[in-house]
């Protein structure tokens, strides 16, 4: 799951244009165009429920066949091939019952150990209509990483794939500062068939360096395991099963979907004519913050953070504008290997390794007193 540089994803011919845009917006020393992103997502949600474990995180390996197909190849043959390629895995009624018991016993307010709410559930691969898909019977992945296998390779616990011959899974993340080992919680659902571990929760819990749980919400701090260092709030009780992360987003790199991607990350949209791709339409109204630390104090989630500006992309809605389809994809990533690294990013002395639209926000301490409402409490002592 090693990432590749943006110029490999978009094509070498885009390098000059990225550099020109960076210069115009004073985004010097941004990680463009060599920013590394671990994978790209195309056509649909950034995750699927574990019983929809195909298709695909499409790993980027700069090839035109097998993994990392180009867009045209993916939309024609690639979209159907993972269905028959992924291993066949089944689930059991006893495991489903374990999920229900875990949910009923673990739903209380305040800081809850997610380990108390975790469960072991096998994966059943099915298509969007719910029917059993075809696939290999040797529990091996042939051509593509399906969702469950991609998560497993990143260290996410998918119990039925623990024997899959891939990268060993770490399985458990430790919340920094508190020494609390946690596992992913299950998603609340009225349907027994839907009582499966929340994939997005697992992805977050594995790919983050810090995590806290409060009043049914999981708040995390990203790391270089995902293409961004933004935080997101994941509500376990979302009945639709959609996460707030990249909801309703297509990432066809090199198109205006890059602009949509940035809009989704920042939680706002400059074109009010369509809100389907905006996080606000999904109930996430908090502004984006980069987080320096997380903790829970007296049932309040407290973290050190600074408010992110409008990360440099062209906000024009003019379809004829030359920058509309560029959207500065490099601004969506913050490589930890770039100059200054994580400390500069947190301190915000140079914005995203460079000024964010020439604005620099001071570090602040913020408190989530009620889910969805931010209260600035000033600097900590």
Curated annotation (Swiss-Prot):
Belongs to the MgpC family. Transmembrane segments: none annotated. Residues 1-109 are annotated as: Disordered. Signal peptide: none annotated. InterPro entries: MgpC (IPR007885). Residues 13-31, 89-109 have a biased composition (Polar residues). Residues 40-51, 61-73 have a biased composition (Basic and acidic residues). This is Putative MgpC-like protein MPN_503.
């Amino acid at each position: 799951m090693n990432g590749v540089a943006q110029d490999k994803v978009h094509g070498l011919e885009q390098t000059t244009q990225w550099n020109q845009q960076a210069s115009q917006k004073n985004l010097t020393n941004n990680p463009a165009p060599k920013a590394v992103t671990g994978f790209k997502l195309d056509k649909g949600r950034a995750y699927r429920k574990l019983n929809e474990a195909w298709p695909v995180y499409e790993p980027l390996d700069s090839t035109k066949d097998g993994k990392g197909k180009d867009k045209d190849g993916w939309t024609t043959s690639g979209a159907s091939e993972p269905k028959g390629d992924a291993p066949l895995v089944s689930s059991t009624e006893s495991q489903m019952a374990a999920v229900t018991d875990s949910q009923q016993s673990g739903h209380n307010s305040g800081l809850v150990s997610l380990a108390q709410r975790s469960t072991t559930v096998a994966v059943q691969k099915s298509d969007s209509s719910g029917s059993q898909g075809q696939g290999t019977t040797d529990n091996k992945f042939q051509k593509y990483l399906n969702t469950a296998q991609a998560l497993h390779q990143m260290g996410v616990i998918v119990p039925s794939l623990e024997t899959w011959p891939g990268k060993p899974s770490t399985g458990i993340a430790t919340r920094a500062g508190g020494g609390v080992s946690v596992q992913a919680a299950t998603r609340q659902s009225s349907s027994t068939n839907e009582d499966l571990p929340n994939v997005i929760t697992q992805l977050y819990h594995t790919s983050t360096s810090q995590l806290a749980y409060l009043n049914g919400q999981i708040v995390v701090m990203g790391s270089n395991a995902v293409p961004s260092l933004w935080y997101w709030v994941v509500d376990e009780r979302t009945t639709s099963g959609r996460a707030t992360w990249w909801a309703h987003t297509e990432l066809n790199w090199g198109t205006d979907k890059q602009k949509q991607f940035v809009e989704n990350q920042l939680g706002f949209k400059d074109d009010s004519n369509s809100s389907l791709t905006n996080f606000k339409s999904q109930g996430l109204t908090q502004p984006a913050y980069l987080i320096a630390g997380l903790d829970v104090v007296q049932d309040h989630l407290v973290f050190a953070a600074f408010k992110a500006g409008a990360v440099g992309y062209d906000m024009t809605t003019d379809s004829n504008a030359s920058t509309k389809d560029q959207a500065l994809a490099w601004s969506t990533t913050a490589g930890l290997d770039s100059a200054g690294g994580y400390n500069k990013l947190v301190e915000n002395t140079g914005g995203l390794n460079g000024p964010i639209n020439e604005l620099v926000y001071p570090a602040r301490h913020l408190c989530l007193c009620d889910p969805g409402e931010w209260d600035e409490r000033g600097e900590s002592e």
